[in-house]
């Protein structure tokens, strides 16, 4: 295996984590930014400072906190979130009954979505030539209290 593609020891990775309330809808949406660094990947220009090897951006969504504005809030953020919201929820942020009905539902959604936060991952980026095939993002999100 090429030295550039050697798997990194993921136990040595460090995570920096930021949660920022949304400017317009802080009760319903929070931005999540997760950056992963590894001690073997250092900048040659800035005093050997660790450089990021991977990034994750996501939203924490609280549908239950939106009152009757859930779909409008999702629509104001992005087309992707609007489509997600309109597919699964009503305007009050409640999961559509057709998805949880025992006879009609698909069996993987339940009424617990009416009172739980949702982590919607928007983007994951990994530096080229970094082998992180077994990288467990949820490990870092859990460590920082997101899950």
Predicted regions and their residues:
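Hydrophobic positions on the alpha1 helix immediately C-terminal to the Walker A/P-loop
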Residues: 139
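Non-catalytic substrate-recognition and accessory regions of acyl/acetyltransferase enzymes
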Residues: 1-131, 142-147
